[in-house]
Regions:
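Active-site mouth of glycoside hydrolases
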Residues: 1-210, 232, 244-259, 270-275, ...
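Alpha-helical scaffold elements lining the catalytic groove of polysaccharide deacetylases
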Residues: 121-125, 215-221, 225-226
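Short acidic/histidine-rich active-site segments
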Residues: 235-241
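Histidine/acidic-residue-rich catalytic or RNA/ligand-binding cores of hydrolases
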Residues: 216-221, 246-266, 284-289
């Protein structure tokens, strides 16, 4: 079992720093890792002290930071200071012993047609992923690449497009890196989809946020071993609540504790159960360390 946790982005000047941890952002400002290096290092030291070996960290999210766009809306490459921030993150991961699961993009990337076009063409892979892998592909501080977080929350994007993009990214990562590849599946019921050979994944990932008000919204992981899913690859519970008492308004979590998830993972043959989130970036709170 892999002891892991969702970082998933820093807190900068008291605010969640979603999409702005790496490089210049669309507001022509910089709030990346190197802008608060000591705080990030302290976070990793705390995770290491708590026994975590991998942390899941979002990189380009919805395209607001870390990448450059031409005046016409075409993806042109990584943003200024991106490599400064990622160099620092990789060094901190290496020195702390907490490796990185880097989430390349979030499902919100798919909300804009120009951003989708960058995935449907070779732009993202050739102009963003390739330079990234050329610099970090051989670095063992990176445990894995999560190509896209929860794409099943954007079913409007054709599944053939999703398979083609993730498959191409996976091929490029495997060509240039020893790191593993996954997709952050947003629903338990989607697990079988990620096992399709088109994605080229090394392990399958599902996220579990059961809601007592809507028991039919998704399947449950409880009462099931990883083998019960009938997958050809290992299965990770990549996100789960830290505390059943901490949840957003309008969401009613069952009484499963983080200890229950970890016991399920241990006894059920899962790769692990990674709580959301170390930085308490939303109402689901943070686990006790």
């Amino acid at each position: 079992m892999i002891p892991g946790i969702n970082y998933p982005w820093t807190i900068f000047q008291g605010r969640p720093n979603y999409g702005c941890d790496f490089g210049w952002n669309k507001w022509n400002s910089h709030a990346g890792v190197t802008a608060h290096l000591d705080e990030v290092r302290a976070d990793f030291e705390s995770m290491a002290s708590a026994g975590y070996e991998v942390t899941r960290w979002f990189v380009f999210t919805d395209g607001r930071g870390g990448v450059d766009w031409s005046p016409g809306g075409e993806l042109s490459g990584v943003a200024d200071r991106f490599f400064d921030d990622m160099d620092a993150a990789v060094e901190i991961a290496r020195s702390s012993g907490v490796r990185l699961c880097l989430v390349l993009i979030d499902f919100a990337w798919l909300d804009d047609p120009l951003r989708r076009a960058a995935l449907e063409s070779a732009a993202f892979i050739d102009r963003v992923l390739d330079p990234f892998l050329d610099r970090y592909g051989g670095d063992d501080a990176i445990h894995s690449y999560d190509v896209i977080n929860e794409p099943d929350w954007r079913p409007q994007w054709p599944i053939d497009n999703l398979r083609a993009f993730v498959g191409a990214a996976s091929n490029r990562i495997h060509l240039k890196s020893r790191a593993l590849v996954t997709v952050g599946g947003g629903r338990v019921r989607s697990a079988k989809e990620w096992d399709d050979a088109a994605y080229g994944l090394d392990f399958i990932q599902v996220h579990s946020y059961p809601d007592l008000r809507y028991p039919d919204r998704d399947e449950t992981v409880f009462g099931r071993t990883a083998a019960d899913f009938g997958l050809s690859k290992p299965l990770l519970i990549g996100e789960c609540p830290s505390d059943p008492r901490a949840h957003p308004d309008g969401h009613l979590s069952p009484a499963y504790t983080l200890a229950d998830y970890l016991n399920l993972a241990r006894e059920g043959g899962y790769l692990g159960a990674w709580p959301w989130s170390f930085k308490a970036v939303d109402a689901f709170g943070a686990p006790a360390l």
